[in-house]
């Protein structure tokens, strides 16, 4: 009866793998608008490009802060 249930680390691994596979299907760069596009469309393209760049630059700092908060600084521990 217990053999049919999967452990939570296995389920988390499967979910993470599924998210990675789905992430590969999404375009990471916005497609540039053609020359005949309206000024509004050009503006939306440049705004989305700027937003993606800003998020890409900000996220490593956010992740580092999050990890240091929850994991802590393990390098400063002394062994007794």
Swiss-Prot record:
Signal peptide: 1-32
UniProt keyword annotations, A-Z: Antibiotic, Antimicrobial, Calcium, Calmodulin-binding, Signal
One GO process term, biological-process aspect: feeding behavior
GO molecular function: calmodulin binding; neuropeptide hormone activity; neuropeptide Y receptor binding
Protein name: Caltrin
Domain of life: Eukaryota
Described purpose of this protein according to its UniProt entry: Inhibits calcium transport into spermatozoa; it does not bind directly to calcium. Binds to calmodulin. Inhibits the growth of microorganisms. Seem to act as an antibiotic by permeabilizing the bacterial membrane.
The keyword Transcription regulation is annotated on this UniProt entry: no
GO CC list: extracellular space
